[in-house]
Amino acid sequence: AHDKMPRFDRGVFLAPMVRSGALPCRLLALEYGADLVWGPEVVDRAIMGTERRVHPSTGLVEFIKDGKQVFSCHPIERPYLIYQVGSSTPENAAEAVRIVTAHDDVAGVDLNCGCPKPFSTLGGMGANLLTMPDLLCEILKAMRRAAPPHVSVTCKIRLLPTQAQTLDLVERIVRTRTIRALTIHCRTKPMRPREPALLDRFRDVAAHVAKVAQGKGQEETRV
């Protein structure tokens, strides 16, 4: 069993994406020196009701439902693997966390609050959570309660239209005392990858996270 949380204060990470980060990609990233790797976003209801199977010769772990693989991982990546959850309800998010942590398959769980794609936002997930901070924070609290103590909880957000709105949201998230790290995609919800990221806004957000975290005795919270 593993008893140490992953470290977010330094290193090279395979960042959380929505439809990228499957097992082959993660293993390749680790081979090239990644310190932590995020899996693809898996909607909470997709992992619920799955059967966990372990391949006897390779050790491959698969979560299967209706004859299809929903998620796969391997013990070799366990200390570095962050499982990414798509959710819009605390109850379902907690159940998803319990399922993927029941056999100590992952080092951390991450709530996606940044995906702007319709498949995510139509269900109230992803970037839609940015405008529902109460719900977002309740989901994080539920995930923290459901996760074993040594499994980290993190989340990913996008920038809100104004810096003041972004700083307020970040402060509310940090004050939940649930997260070890916050990933910030430096684009707003309507922006697409071809548009330059708003990197000039990152410094103030990072400084605000550090200030709030220190005030709450959470010096370990990273951005």
Segments predicted by a language model, with ranges:
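Flavin-dependent oxidoreductase catalytic cores
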Residues: A1-V223
